[in-house]
Amino acid sequence: MNTLTASPQNLTELQECLEIAKKQNLKIAIKAGGNSYSDVFLASNHLIIDISNIDSILSFDSENGFVIVESGVRIGNLLKMIMPKNWGLVGLSGSVTDLIGGMLSSNTHGKDTWKNGNFSKNILSFKLLLANGKIEEVSRQKNIELFNGVVGGLGFLGIVVEITLKLNPIKSFMVKRATKKIYNFGDMIEHFYTLEKSGSDFSYVLLDPFSSTKSLGKGICESSMYVNAPKCTDAQFEEFLYPKRKIGLLKPETFWSTIRPFWGNNTCSLVNKLRFFRSQNNFTKYSVEPFPKIQYGYSALPKFNLLYAPYGFFELQSIFPKENTIHAFTELLAVSNQFKSEPWICMVKRHKPDTSYLTFSGDGLSIAINFPLKSLNSNLREKYCNKLFEIILKFNGKIYLSKHANIPKSIFQKMYPDYKKMSDLKNRYDPDFVFSSDATNRLLVENS
């Protein structure tokens, strides 16, 4: 049997899908925004349930900052409603097409995670459709174990159908943004660990992976903060809350096929050098722009992944304790150079700890490396991944599960020792593995 897909329109239809799947002995994988690079919603001979049509905003208390949403609500639609009322959310990823249910299940993080933590900090409670067909109301107060298992749990335990969020007060939806040069890893560490004094809300560093050994760690830092400033027009605010259909006058397919022959390591190296040259030594120049433009700038470049066609790309994000960061980053970039797979994108963020069992978090810095697969055949790719895993374990790091589909179970268990708690919850709430994606089978099924 081939994989089937269902797109229920409401809770009743969702429950019917669950019952039909159980009667037909089909396992269920859950698809939200479809932005994960992992295999969390992929499955062979399964029923994939797409929750994107269960997308009502049920209530919004604009005075006190509470909102109740169904799990298929798109983040862009929610921000359009709450930000003009001076409310925001924390721990947002860079994809404007993320669904709230998927953000909960991945426990996303963002450029403000150093200050506010992961997306879980917004969550007061949620309703969970269990394998037995019952709906369980979950919160930190009612069931902390299930809360910590479902948040960041990649859909392993059930389907989140409704979420109550506590919003974050903001000065306005306007943000002041500035960049400065980072000359080495020492500069980078100093920047991230003096952020509390800066007044910033958001910050990240883009490293230049093509820099020489002497200037390894060179790059630019961007920091920004909410400000009381004259608001832009509604059209300017909403422009980046929706994925664009064209890049200029061109369809994305045409644009990227035109750019692709001229794009490679040399082009990326040049872009990094120009970006560094144009930046200031200090945060002396800034611009004031609407939050969506800063958060979702990539929405102006739809189907960005087509730049890597036809071979695709590989992304791995790993986090390390502060004291291990420089050595870990140095070795990761050295291995990339050894395999002639320098990342085209190399971003660093600071994080905070989180209590959820499978959440990508901790008191340290993460590095995301994104590189094309054109130069790596399957054999080289496996060797490269194994070397990366070795380095990450060596420096007590862990990998973001939503961005990598090749982590062996043995590596996963070392990086996420709370997997035992997840296994216990799985046996308690879904012993027949009704909810079972390729990721579930790879990471939680015994003898897989």
Segments from the language model and where they lie:
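Noncatalytic alpha-helical scaffold of FAD-dependent oxidoreductases
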Residues: 1-448
